[in-house]
């Protein structure tokens, strides 16, 4: 049996005889037997109907009832199905029915057609007494014209209307079933006590038409939801009159009651309050739990409910959310739901008529191909009834049929689903993909690229195809099938069209090269030798595949990624470090003349590893993370030229000639890019080096070489000597901090360009190429080295790199020093360049503010110098404490912390019991601290509040422990001394500061300004000795127009404006006056 027969709605005891209620209870008991067939139960149910009808008065001679089925012209399908039963209803008195009750019921021949039973049921429903008032006028008009030949047939329908339809999804309002003798005054004399009246023709005719036109395709075997497809009708067909007037309804059987007491009595009698979810395995295929529940299928429609209330693991649909929840809890399927495949973005943008064709192309071949596409119809998926799944819905948005087919698809397409969106590498599990994302930082790239959707339409479609459709699963060693490549899921930018248009021959070439690289990569993974020639890409490999350049570079990215993972797993192949963390430790001493080039692994937001190669291999190996945004055609054309050049299509002599022409006549923006790259290749080949390039190096260089355009515009020569910036020394390696170390990719690439360009110098006229803007960005973001000042020697390119030992980690949070050193000291520093660099600096800070972790060293105000050493850094820390960068205490000026800690210790009050009580600093003390340190009152308040919170929560902070125990211990940050009393601690801190806290108010801002001026003089001397470029005139100071305070640098004024006055740094021109010193 497909489902349990639904019980008839119960009427209130005030309107239904007790015998009828008892009969209904007997009927419910009979329906509990689930082993009977559909026909037997239906006949049994009709028997119960007949039993109730015989106890109810019947009025066959009514002219209204005789007109029930004949006027609409539908051939009275209901009366035909009732012929067998009408013969037993010829008696018009209740007594006659009682006499014949025991004699005739066993001889009744019942219809076996379930559709005919449904029609009979609805006939009974529509002849209910509650409709008589509404249809009175219609009945009057039909009285005279209707024949009376079918009186017995229609009166049977009326009589059975005294019982409710057991299959209707709504409730008959019992309050309307009153004595209607006054309303039916037009009937014959027999209609004196009418508890059951006639139905109407218009509604019955409409229902007959609906039933005749509806075809119910029965499956050969009953399924879980066949009853829903067969019997359940939406209540929207009948309008709002079926909603019922009673307020209290039984959820199980939909019986309606006027009072809560009656509903409670019903619940107790029938046990309908019990939980029906106790399905036994044997019964699960025969019936369904909670059949009368008001479900989403009734309210919203069957298909929508099946789409929403579907188990993602096994594919079963459910009538209500409660059933789905019970299923999930019982089967634990919520723990087994696999990773859902990404929905192609292209399907959201195209009409549904085109979705099927795209899905046929995009999905891999599978046994369920015909039924899994979102646009597929039910008829397609049900061509083979035994293969078709009964849970398939027409609008299956998840693209699978059931648990088995979905699992098959997931396994078959796991390499595509668990794929890094950035580099295309596939993984065997979600954990491996997560680890890959964390190691490479690709999650940041994907996030950033996803936020820039819609801005990448400038790229050539052909190049977009090449870039987005490169299948590179480095963890897959077997040859990939052709359908795997053709039908991979869309990338986040939606590349379905590009995949359809890809050239299959080019795919073959690319895939061969990819597999070749993968095999080379995995041939000897455990070798420790850093100089293994065939482990990385060679120029010979590039020569063999002129068309597959992009794929080769992409494969090299994966090779480098695998090297990183090996390093983290303890089996490095590049430097002999036991782990990647050991690579961050500074060696004790490094030979000064060691010419090795340090190659920095660059990521979008931080450095993954630092590789130190032997002197024989000055190779630059970069990570997969490419910082190039594909936003301009010139980038693409430059890349194409670069690939052609690397593959040997253009010889070097021709490049030299073009380079000479380029010095005189500036051409299109991509041209100088390619020419300089060719010059780089020539220089490297002349030195006999084995060049190992990566995608980042090749694609970023075009952006970094146009720097020379604005440089030459301002009358300066390009770089001729290697600068002691971050990428030329181990000083770039930072110590361990809670956050990942950040190496500026732009500055690292600039140093690479400095390395390769060496003595290349050519003046180029400025062009409108947006690539030129990146030069300014790189200038403003170059990392600051912290080394003792040493003059940079003009030596040959092989001996230009020195490793300088320094204990001080580099401050990577400020882009204040741009170390550019040239052999020409007569440079021009134009105001235009100065202001442009400041604007670019502001823009870069806005772009990279959240990605830049805070440094563990104190940062300083000055951002105006182009080169600096650690001695000047320390001097400025001591002498210019104004406007420090606020944040964690690790970024604070130690002097400021000493002052704040001393003031806090002085505010502690000792009680008679020997304990200390925290008291707040007075406003005057705060003002004194603010005047001396330059810290805002808000910053001071926040620091104090943070210290108090830590003391209350844990009883201690960095400089004070055990305050709550009555035996506090004070710690000095400078010398790690410990003190037991606040007075001795304050005295000790004053010795570090060099003055007493009482004298703090005597120090004015003028003293601080003088110290800044002294620092400026020292810095200027250092810059003149190094010959660096100075952005600002050393004889100028800047005054805030709002408060008339003066500052030594523009950046200090802008910090002041933003922190003190809340002004945007971009508005500094409005609020700043530049003062020239005489």
Swiss-Prot record:
Residue span of region Disordered: 1-110, 140-197, 271-300, 365-394, 472-524, 850-877
Major place of residence: nucleus
MF annotations from Gene Ontology: DNA binding; DNA-binding transcription factor activity, RNA polymerase II-specific; zinc ion binding
Keyword list, A-Z: Developmental protein, DNA-binding, Homeobox, Metal-binding, Nucleus, Repeat, Repressor, Transcription, Transcription regulation, Zinc, Zinc-finger
Compositionally biased region (Polar residues): 57-71, 853-862
UniProt DNA-binding region: 885-955
Family, per entry: Belongs to the teashirt C2H2-type zinc-finger protein family.
Protein name: Teashirt homolog 1-A
Originating species: Xenopus laevis
Encoding gene (name): tshz1-a
């Amino acid at each position: 049996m497909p489902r349990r027969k639904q019980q008839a709605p119960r009427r209130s005891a005030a309107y239904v005889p007790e015998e009828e209620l008892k009969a209904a209870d007997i009927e419910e008991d009979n329906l509990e037997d689930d082993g009977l067939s559909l026909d037997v139960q239906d006949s049994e149910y009709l028997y119960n109907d007949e039993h109730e009808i015989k106890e109810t008065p019947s009025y066959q001679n009514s002219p209204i009832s005789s007109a029930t089925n004949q006027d609409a012209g539908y051939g009275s399908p209901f009366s035909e199905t009732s012929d067998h039963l009408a013969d037993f209803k010829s008696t018009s008195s209740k007594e006659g029915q009682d006499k014949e009750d025991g004699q005739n019921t066993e001889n009744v021949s019942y219809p076996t057609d379930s559709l005919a039973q449904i029609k009979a049921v609805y006939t009974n429903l529509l002849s209910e007494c509650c409709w008589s008032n509404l249809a009175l006028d219609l009945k009057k008009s039909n009285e005279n014209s209707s024949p009376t030949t079918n009186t017995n047939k229609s009166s049977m329908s009326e009589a059975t209307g005294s019982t409710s339809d057991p299959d209707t999804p709504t409730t008959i309002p019992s309050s309307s079933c009153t004595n209607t003798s006054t309303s039916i005054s037009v009937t014959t004399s027999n209609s004196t006590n009418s508890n059951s009246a006639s139905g109407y023709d218009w509604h019955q005719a409409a229902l007959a038409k609906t039933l005749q036109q509806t075809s119910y395709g029965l499956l050969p075997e009953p399924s879980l939801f066949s009853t829903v497809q067969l019997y359940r009708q939406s209540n929207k067909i009948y309008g709002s009159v079926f909603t019922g007037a009673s307020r209290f309804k039984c959820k199980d059987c939909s019986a309606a009651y006027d009072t809560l007491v009656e509903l409670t009595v019903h619940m107790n009698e029938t046990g309908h309050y019990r939980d029906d979810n106790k399905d036994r395995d044997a019964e699960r295929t025969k019936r369904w739990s909670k059949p009368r529940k008001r479900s989403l299928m009734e309210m919203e429609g069957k298909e929508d409910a099946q789409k929403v209330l579907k188990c993602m693991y096994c594919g079963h649909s459910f009538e209500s959310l409660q059933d789905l929840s019970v299923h999930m809890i019982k089967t634990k399927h919520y723990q087994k739901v696999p990773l859902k495949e990404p929905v192609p973005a292209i399907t959201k943008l195209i009409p549904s008529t085109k979705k099927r064709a795209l899905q046929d192309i995009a999905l891999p071949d599978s046994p369920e191909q015909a039924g899994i596409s979102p646009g597929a119809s039910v008829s397609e998926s049900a061509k083979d009834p035994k293969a078709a799944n009964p849970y398939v819905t027409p609008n299956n948005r998840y693209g699978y049929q059931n648990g088995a087919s979905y699992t098959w698809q997931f396994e078959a397409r796991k390499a595509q689903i668990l794929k890094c969106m950035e580099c295309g590498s596939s993984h065997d599990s979600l954990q491996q993909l997560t680890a890959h994302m964390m190691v490479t930082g690709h999650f940041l790239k994907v996030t950033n690229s996803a936020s820039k959707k819609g801005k990448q339409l400038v790229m050539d479609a052909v190049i977009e195809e090449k870039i987005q459709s490169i299948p590179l699963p480095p963890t897959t060693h077997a040859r990939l099938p052709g359908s795997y490549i053709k039908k991979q899921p869309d990338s986040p930018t939606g590349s379905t069209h590009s995949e359809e248009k890809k050239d299959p021959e080019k795919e073959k070439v690319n895939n061969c090269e990819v597999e070749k690289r993968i095999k080379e990569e995995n041939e000897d993974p455990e070798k420790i030798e850093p100089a293994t020639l065939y482990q990385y890409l060679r120029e010979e490999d590039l020569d063999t595949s002129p068309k597959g350049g992009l794929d080769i570079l992409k494969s090299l990215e994966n090779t480098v990624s695998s090297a990183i993972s090996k390093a983290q797993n303890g089996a490095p192949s590049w430097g002999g470090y036991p782990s990647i963390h050991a690579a961050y430790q500074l060696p004790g001493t490094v030979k000064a003349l060691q010419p090795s080039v340090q190659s920095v692994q660059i990521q979008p937001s931080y450095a993954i590893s630092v590789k130190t190669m032997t002197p024989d291999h000055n190779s630059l190996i970069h990570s997969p993370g490419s910082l190039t945004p594909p936003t301009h055609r010139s980038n693409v054309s430059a890349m194409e030229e670069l690939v052609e050049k690397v593959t040997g299509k253009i010889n070097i002599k021709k490049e030299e000639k073009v380079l000479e022409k380029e010095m005189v006549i500036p051409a299109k923006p991509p041209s100088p890019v390619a020419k300089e790259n060719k010059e780089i290749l020539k220089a490297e080949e002349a030195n006999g080096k084995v060049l190992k390039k990566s995608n980042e190096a090749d694609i970023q260089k075009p952006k970094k070489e146009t720097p020379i355009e604005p440089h030459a515009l301002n009358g300066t020569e390009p770089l001729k000597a290697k600068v002691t910036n971050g990428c030329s020394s181990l000083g770039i390696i930072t110590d361990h901090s809670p956050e990942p170390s950040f190496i500026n990719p732009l500055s690292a690439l600039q140093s690479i360009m400095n390395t390769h360009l060496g003595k290349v110098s050519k003046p180029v006229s400025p062009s409108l190429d947006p690539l030129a803007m990146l030069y300014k960005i790189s200038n403003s973001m170059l990392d600051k080295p912290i080394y003792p000042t040493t003059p940079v020697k003009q030596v040959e390119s092989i001996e230009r790199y020195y490793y300088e030992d320094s204990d001080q980690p580099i401050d990577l949070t400020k882009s204040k020093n741009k170390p550019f050193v040239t052999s020409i000291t007569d440079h021009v520093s134009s105001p235009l360049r100065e202001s442009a660099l400041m604007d670019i600096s502001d823009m870069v800070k806005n772009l990279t503010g959240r990605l830049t972790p805070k440094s563990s060293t104190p940062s300083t105000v000055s951002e105006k110098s182009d080169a600096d050493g650690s001695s000047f850094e320390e001097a400025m820390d001591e002498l210019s404490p104004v406007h420090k960068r606020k944040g964690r205490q690790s970024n604070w000026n130690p002097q400021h912390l000493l002052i704040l800690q001393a003031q806090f210790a002085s505010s502690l009050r000792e009680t008679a019991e020997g304990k200390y009580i925290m008291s707040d600093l007075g406003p005057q003390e705060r003002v004194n601290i603010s005047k001396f340190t330059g810290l805002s009152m808000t910053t001071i308040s926040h620091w104090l509040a943070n210290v108090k919170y830590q003391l209350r929560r844990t009883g201690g902070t960095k400089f004070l422990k055990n305050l709550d125990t009555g035996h506090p211990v004070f710690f000095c940050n400078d010398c790690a001394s410990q003190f037991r009393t606040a007075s001795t601690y304050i005295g000790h801190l004053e010795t570090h500061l060099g003055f007493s806290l009482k004298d703090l108010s005597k120090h004015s801002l003028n003293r601080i300004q003088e110290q800044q001026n002294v620092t400026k003089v020292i810095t200027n001397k250092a810059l003149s000795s190094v010959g660096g470029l100075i952005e600002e005139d050393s004889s100028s100071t800047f005054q805030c127009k709002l408060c008339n305070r003066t500052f030594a640098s523009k950046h200090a004024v802008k910090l002041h404006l933003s922190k003190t006055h809340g002004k945007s740094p971009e508005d500094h021109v409005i609020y700043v006056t530049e003062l020239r010193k005489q």
